[in-house]
């Protein structure tokens, strides 16, 4: 579900790469500061992107910190901000419900790793939901909606993507709705879902029986993804992002296209 929204680092300047890394590390430290060490493991690029999108347009204040991942060399870490705290709160709640979703989707033995992870995060989740109770309720509601569509074997990509898109909409109302529609997750999980006999909207949309997308289906998904990214980029163009502009340009105009193509070709890692 997570990890697709990241900049194309080879095309970033050293300054922008360091700036992005400072936010990534800042979110990690914010998760640890507020929710404990185990919470750091829910860190992902998607909520780093959210923290950037919600940050002030000016150069962020940074601190020099060491951590378990970088014990020898201090890193430049974005100092505590409302944007980081918002990203941390929402990412913790969403990660918890993603674990619960995995537990429901897998058999007893295959779900053991997810049960253990949920046990470690239970206290952090209970704390996080007190800060964002409306979002916590929203996640439950939209995931129930998603499960209902899974049980119905919904063949519409738009309808299958809608619950998670609506969930993302509840995180940041300032972000245009087109920035939240994602089909790429279904394409990335297609083979895994086929082997485990889990619901995947692409399977029903294109009436596929195997564990691979055929060429015609792949082209149709690519067209849908390109259209979605184009509309997201159009919405993004209306924002004023200051020092974050180069990083966000890289995401909207390069990275999302590249990652989508890599997923469809089976070369994404």
Regions found by a protein language model. Give the residues of each.
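Acidic catalytic motifs of isoprenoid enzymes
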Residues: 1-179, 183-218, 222-226, 236-244, ...
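Membrane-proximal bilayer-interacting regions
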Residues: 247-261
């Amino acid at each position: 579900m997570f990890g697709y929204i990241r900049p194309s680092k080879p095309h970033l300047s050293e300054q922008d790469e360091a700036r992005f890394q400072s936010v990534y590390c800042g979110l990690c430290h914010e998760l640890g500061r507020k929710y404990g060490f185990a919470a750091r493991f829910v860190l992902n690029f998607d909520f780093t992107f959210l923290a950037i999108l919600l940050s002030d347009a000016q150069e962020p204040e940074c601190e020099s910190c060491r951590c378990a991942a970088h014990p020898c060399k201090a890193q430049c870490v974005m100092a505590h901000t409302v944007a980081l705290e918002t990203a941390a709160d929402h990412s913790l709640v969403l990660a918890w419900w993603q674990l619960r979703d995995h537990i429901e989707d897998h058999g007893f033995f295959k779900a053991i790793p997810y049960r253990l992870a949920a046990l470690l995060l239970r206290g952090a989740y209970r704390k996080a939901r007190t800060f964002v109770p409306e979002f916590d309720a929203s996640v439950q509601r939209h995931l129930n909606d998603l499960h209902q569509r899974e049980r119905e074997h919904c063949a519409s990509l738009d309808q299958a993507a809608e619950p998670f898109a609506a969930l993302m909409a509840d995180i940041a109302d300032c972000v245009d709705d087109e920035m939240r529609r994602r089909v790429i997750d279904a394409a990335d999980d297609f083979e895994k879902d086929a082997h485990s006999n889990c619901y995947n909207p692409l399977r029903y949309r294109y009436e596929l029986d195997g564990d691979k997308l055929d060429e015609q289906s792949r082209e149709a998904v690519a067209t849908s993804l390109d259209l979605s990214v184009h509309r997201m980029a159009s919405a993004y163009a209306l924002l004023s992002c200051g020092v974050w502009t180069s990083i966000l340009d890289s995401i909207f105009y390069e990275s999302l296209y590249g990652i989508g193509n890599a997923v469809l070709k089976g070369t994404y890692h």
